[in-house]
Amino acid sequence: KKTINVKDVEEVVAKIARIPPKSVSTDDKNTLLSLEQDLKRVVFGQDNAIQALASAIKLSRAGLREPEKPIGNYLFSGPTGVGKTEVARQLSIVLGVELVRFDMSEYMERHSVSRLIGAPPGYVGFDQGGLLTDSIDQHPHCVLLLDEIEKAHPDLFNILLQVMDHGKMTDHNGKKVDFRNVILIMTTNAGASDLAKEAVGFGRTQRSGDDTEAINRMFSPEFRNRLDAVIPFAGLSKEIISRVVEKFIMQLEVQLGDRNVSIEISEEARSWIGSKGYDKNFGARPLARVVQEHVKKPLAEELLFGRLTGGGLVSIDIQDGELSFDYTNTKATDSG
């Protein structure tokens, strides 16, 4: 005889109300309490940005926000590859809500903006609905990420103004979509190119405020005025890159673990990967490319056709200034 327990009821209620299952049973105080630490554990070198974001979310969850607005409207600014999108992704995981992401490079033309709220009656695609309005209708509790917002057509900003101010949007059918339980995050690289330039003479230390000037140039006053916070992200230092190397290696260990392969990487090899992949202007992305090119590609050959097809151990070290791989087939040693 099957019995229905509390967890089953919570899941059904969560589906009907379209809210995260976690929010049904537990107060999210514990989640908010550890929010800052949880984010710092997975995104490195952005302590100030994470602190500002966590404080802003706690403020809104404490009931001190205006009830008709979204939970928060945040603009993440900073150079490429420093963790802006990753913070939004990890925030959705920590809060247990859906991440709804739109790349604004797809909405550079005026006509493409109508895809977000749906085409008006009489136009092609009227029956399909808007991508943004449909997504929020299906996931009213979510982190809405608009990536590289500066690439979007100016008409999109006019649509966002009402969302940021009143927490509602009307789609092409006249249906009102509720944004009041949405955390709206927009990312921008505005000013990153200015920050990358070397300052002349005594102005060398004053580069940190340049992205504010670029944001002021790029976004209208009424748009900036509706933001809860502009959260600047700093470039990654060499010390932070070494921690990112550790993160990539841990991810690789998990991937290899599924194939019964263990990995050992010496400190010299870790330092080599870090120095090879460090570029202060491009953040962690060059590092990911170095790991893929110099570590994953040689391993892929061995996993598919070589000495790791049945599992084993791989030791990575430095030899003659390059990475060297030493493979041990555990099956062979066990039988011997």
Where are these regions (language model features)?
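AAA+ P-loop NTPase nucleotide-binding core of proteostasis motors
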Residues: 1-336
